[in-house]
């Protein structure tokens, strides 16, 4: 955050307390006349009228001292009251953060134009916050993998600066790294969380105080939404009543958190359901939400095969997004009923793109790193759509600034308050025209030698440049068992991520594409998704918005590639990325690579995988 950026003192008057208090008025009424008496007494004394006996002079001096003390106390008390009266009230912070939710919301169809897959998504509650606040069209995560993304968000730093928080499997949190939730707690905030904050990793949810501030005794069935609702329906419960049972758990957890809050203490609450993360019940998008897969026909981007199997899989994913949005609605309603809505900063986003789809999770394409982001609340000049490039590392300094908590110097994120307070739409801050993303290790056994797949990228409005530092490796993991006699079945690939290409989540889309890998029609598509990639990938987003045509070797783009690479590498070096030091040895050796260490908890250690 720049030193010249505005702080909480610039919040609008609507977020402040009343300018005068009854107590202050009483103090002034009682003590102001005493001050006048002292003034009159001193005038008489100066004329010799009070020049009597020494005894009388002593009494006069004592009275003067007493009155002077009262006046000084009154002035101090009044100054304190006036300062308190004009100090802005610190806002509550409600952060709603979904697992595996990219930039898919119905309002993005309105903002970007119809014709794409967002035409089919239904997110009325997210849309409500986006319309009342600011909708960001170019928000990206720093890493398209759960733990490193969350490490960067919670610390306000690039993921490569978070030690073992930079990887997924085998991650361990470094408690010396400042995390915004604990900084807010130390400043007087009542903090709490429900469901996932930081995991997999050890200790789980460490940057939020572990389970000390957990509120989820009302239940966690929402995290397997389609499975649990389908199960209840099978037991004779109506679809609406089945959903309401799960919504009730969300409501109960939030209510318990609010009830535990001391009077007049601002709160910071994190809602992190995992239902959008695979797996989902097949057909649930249509059965539970009325999302017809055929609605997606002709709308699929080039990297998603426009076939029935993939369309149904995507419709089921959108069904979980609809459930997530319904959960948002439950929290907003309860917040409004509690009387806290107007003084609550509401931020809604997700930790990366779609899981188990080409170009999605674990990829640096826009479909993998681009996420939804809407911000509304006190101090936010709403009703705008913003094109500034935002990294979710920017949220930590934004939260701290809202709470008047000093932002640690180590944070590389920049506060969004200059953008949030602006009245402009489109590009607000001319310096926010790019973001940097990257990844290292996701699943530890993705490659037989336990190595990562190191990538860094720079995203701009016109171009995407990706640098693959180890192009000899398989980007989504080794093609285990695909060339031998023990070829995995479609069911295995659908249900087990580690069977083959372990850096892509298991699911029907992955199973279908692997299944047609040798067909004349789809072999090139399979190779393009799972095959080895060149060191440089450059996409002209103006001509190729889906980022499918690599022009890195096109002489016409030589200057663009050189300029973007220099800009990217400069930022990596400026922020101390270990990948830039000694050929990245830090990320290539244990504990950042190699088998999981003994420090990993038992639930982090995978079952043995048969590799060929």
Protein language model features and the residues they cover:
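Bacterial N-terminal signal peptides that target proteins for export
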Residues: 41, 45-48, 54-66
């Amino acid at each position: 955050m720049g030193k010249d950026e505005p702080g909480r003192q610039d919040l609008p008057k609507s977020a402040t307390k009343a300018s005068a208090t009854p107590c202050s008025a009483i103090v002034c009424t009682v003590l102001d006349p005493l001050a006048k008496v002292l003034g009159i007494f001193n005038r008489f004394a100066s004329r010799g009228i009070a020049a009597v006996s020494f005894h009388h002079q002593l009494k006069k001096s004592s009275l003067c001292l007493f009155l002077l003390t009262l006046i000084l106390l009154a002035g101090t008390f009044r100054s304190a009251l006036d300062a308190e009266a004009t100090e802005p009230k610190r806002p509550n912070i409600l952060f709603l953060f979904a697992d595996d939710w990219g930039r898919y919301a119905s309002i993005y169809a309105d903002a970007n134009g119809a014709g794409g897959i967002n035409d089919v998504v239904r997110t009325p509650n997210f849309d409500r916050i986006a319309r009342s606040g600011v909708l960001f069209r170019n928000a990206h995560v720093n890493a398209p993998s759960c733990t490193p993304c969350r490490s960067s968000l919670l610390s306000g730093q690039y993921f490569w600066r978070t030690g073992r928080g930079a990887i997924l499997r085998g991650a361990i949190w470094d408690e010396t790294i400042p995390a915004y939730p604990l900084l807010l707690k130390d400043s007087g905030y009542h903090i709490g969380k429900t469901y996932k904050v930081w995991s997999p990793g050890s200790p789980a949810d460490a940057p939020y105080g572990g389970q000390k501030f957990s509120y989820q005794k009302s239940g966690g069935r929402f995290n397997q939404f389609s499975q649990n609702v389908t199960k209840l329906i099978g037991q004779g419960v109506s679809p609406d009543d089945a959903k309401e049972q799960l919504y009730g758990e969300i409501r109960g957890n939030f209510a318990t958190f609010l009830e535990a809050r001391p009077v007049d203490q601002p709160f910071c609450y994190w809602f992190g359901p995992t239902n959008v993360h695979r797996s989902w019940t097949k057909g649930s998008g249509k059965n539970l939400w009325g999302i017809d897969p055929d609605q997606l026909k002709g709308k699929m981007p080039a990297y998603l095969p426009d076939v029935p199997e993939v369309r149904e899989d995507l419709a089921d994913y959108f069904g979980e997004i609809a459930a997530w949005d319904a959960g948002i609605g439950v929290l907003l309603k309860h917040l409004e009923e509690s009387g806290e809505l107007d003084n609550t900063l509401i931020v809604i986003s997700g930790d990366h793109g779609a899981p188990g789809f080409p170009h999605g999770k674990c990829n640096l394409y826009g479909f993998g790193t681009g996420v939804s982001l809407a911000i509304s609340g006190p101090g936010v000049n709403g009703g705008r759509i913003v094109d500034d490039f935002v990294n979710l590392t920017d949220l930590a300094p934004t939260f701290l600034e809202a709470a008047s908590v000093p932002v640690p110097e180590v944070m590389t994120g920049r506060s969004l308050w200059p953008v949030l307070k602006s009245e402009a739409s489109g590009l607000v801050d001319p310096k926010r025209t790019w973001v940097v993303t990257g990844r290292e290790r996701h699943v530890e056994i993705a490659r037989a030698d336990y190595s990562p797949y190191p990538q860094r990228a720079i995203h701009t409005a016109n171009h995407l440049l990706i640098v693959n530092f180890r192009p000899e490796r398989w980007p989504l993991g080794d093609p285990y068992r695909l060339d031998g006699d023990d070829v995995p079945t479609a069911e295995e690939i659908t249900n087990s991520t580690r069977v083959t290409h372990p850096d892509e989540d298991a699911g029907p889309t992955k199973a279908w594409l692997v299944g047609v890998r040798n067909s004349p029609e789809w072999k090139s598509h399979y190779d393009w998704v799972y095959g080895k990639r060149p060191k440089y990938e450059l996409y002209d987003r103006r001509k190729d918005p889906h980022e499918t045509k690599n022009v890195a070797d096109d002489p016409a783009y030589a200057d663009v590639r050189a300029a973007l690479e220099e800009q990217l590498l400069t930022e990596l070096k400026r922020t101390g990325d270990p990948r830039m030091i000694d050929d990245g040895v830090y990320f290539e050796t244990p504990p950042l690579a190699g088998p999981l260490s003994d420090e990993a908890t038992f639930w982090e250690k995978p079952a043995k995988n048969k590799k060929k």
